[in-house]
Amino acid sequence: MLFYYIQRTAKSIPQIKEIGSLVCQKWGQPLGNNLWGFPGWSKLSKVREEDFRKLKLGYRAKYVHDVAQVVGDDPFYFSNISQLSYDDAKSELIRLPGVGPKIADCALLFGANKTEAFPIDTWIAKVLDSHYGLESFTYSQKALFARKHFGLFCGFAQQFLFSGERLGLIKSK
């Protein structure tokens, strides 16, 4: 999951899917029916940064390469992350190259079952700003507000807010 989220700040979803498919085809295992598995960080740790760049990763190629160097030798890295508290897991992920608070929250919510993670993108920020008056709040302050307001499962609330905003179901004030 983290591989895809590292790209998220610079690419559209179709571009991310395309790059993911290219990476899987180039370094992953064939699964049949023209499908390929994700190669894993261990395999990606052997890929040169230039080879990532050739797949249209742009400046994110360095981050993917550097993360692969850090986690590629530890097959338990992400399972160990999921065993940590939310705060400790987030702190650990943010230490990785190219991983900031939003990417860490996405990886924790969708990849480590940390339901208290509340990723804030422009859609979520718009909802929080217009409905809760949080325009002057930082990312961390908005995320803390969400955890207190929506509780331990605020990550689920985030999904409803995101979908509602994207579908035009949430009326702006």
Regions found by a protein language model. Give the residues of each.
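HhH-family (HhH-GPD) DNA N-glycosylase catalytic core used in base-excision repair
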Residues: 1-173
